Amino acid sequence: MQKDFDKWNEEKKRLDSSESEKRPFPREQWVWVCSVGINIGFEQNGTSNEFERPVLVVKKFNNKMYWVVPLSSKQKPFDFYYNFTDPSERPVALISSQLRLISIQRFKREMYKLSDIDFDNLRAQLKGFLEKSKPRTGRGFSGPEGAL
């Protein structure tokens, strides 16, 4: 299947120049539909004319930047997938290996709040991935021990 990068580029320009009077207010633990675009390789693509995909807000850094994890309707038995059932009783998965930073301009609409237990489990999974690769000390290391 040929990817329409030109169409995504036009949508990306529209998103970048949008100055909505009513900005969304995403909160951690909530699933939102976002314009994530056409990606390269095995990264999760958006669908529809606006290249949308549901994502979970993992961390809010400020009113404009967020860490999100994309959702998939396909559950898989990999350690970087977090499989669960959404509020509509559909099996879905968070693809934690595809954690990414996105701008507020990509957020379209709120879907639902992830349960406390699922959110805590996903955060523990992400933390586990980060702890597997210990920071090196020495040149370039400026943070306190255990800063991550």
Language-model segments: what does each one mean?
Residues M1-E11, N83-L148:
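C-terminal terminal-subdomain/extension
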Residues L15-K22:
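Short alpha-helix capping/helix-loop boundary micro-motifs
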Residues F25-P26, S88:
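Extracellular/periplasmic catalytic domains that process cell-envelope and extracellular macromolecules
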Residues E28-V31:
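Loop/turn positions that initiate beta-strands
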Residues V33-C34, V57:
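Short hydrophobic-aromatic micro-motifs
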Residues V36, P70-L71, Q98:
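Residue-level recognition of conserved beta-strand positions in structured domain cores
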Residues G37-F42:
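Short, charged beta-turn/beta-strand-edge "cap" motif at the junction between a beta-strand
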Residues Q44-S88:
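Compact nucleic-acid interaction/catalytic patches
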